[in-house]
């Protein structure tokens, strides 16, 4: 619902002063592409596109110019600079997830939604990816919401909201 993939039965979601409920399906698709970055458990990279092409795809679909300086800063931060001409199948899972993060950040979205971004990664790589998400949040002034079942991942967050059976049962604030 928060990502605009589905609509709510009651209540609402507002992002950048826009009610998602007021948008039709096509408008929500465009709004999502411009305002919400997604990082999924499955990296959702297109195998036939290079790493560079995968990262810039949302901008190309939207007909937007690429901010080259911002692109370079993102790929440098995520350690992808020397991998841009490679293809997804030649990268490790952690590297593919970094590409997914870069793609999510490039459009400068209002929020990045990361759904189990470490689910397919080993514990060391998981902590590395979460650390990168956290440093990107600070460096790029980005709101990142992570959904996880891993307690170690949750403990790295500034705020933790725990849910069970669709209801919030605790709220923790680690650094606020």
What are these regions (language model features)?
Residues 1-156, 160-163:
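ABC family nucleotide-binding domain
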Residues 160-173:
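H-loop (His-switch) and adjacent beta-strand-loop-beta switch element
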